[in-house]
């Protein structure tokens, strides 16, 4: 692995336009005849693959937290909507099990994924091997986030696709992180 000064000759980048809002920008990098020295080597030669994967562990833990946080936000909005939206004799739609169950399942998935992220973070903080836990946390967090946002969209019905309720844009973010 190399740590390269982006100002070196031969390096260029192009912004990648993403179709939905994400918290960071995406770039395509180009390296054309870039000259590197031993000073550019990061870590030990021949160990780059392991170093790369070890550096991904904290990112995976953070992304799990991002996905579960988005899922919690979506569920909070869905529960509020289910309690406010009234049908049939002024009954909130949240009184119906068909609305409750997907939200309850999504909540369980969010909590399980959060616990896995905490386990991965603990292992990483202790200097223990955290790769397996980090991978599980990211997978579980992304799946839980997707299911929670989907349940929130379903709860909102057609309103789940409107800008007013701010639910649908969340789907692209959690789907990207899957």
Label every model-predicted segment.
Residues 28-33, 54-178:
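Alpha-helical interface subdomain recognition
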Residues 1-76, 80:
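FAD-binding core of flavoproteins
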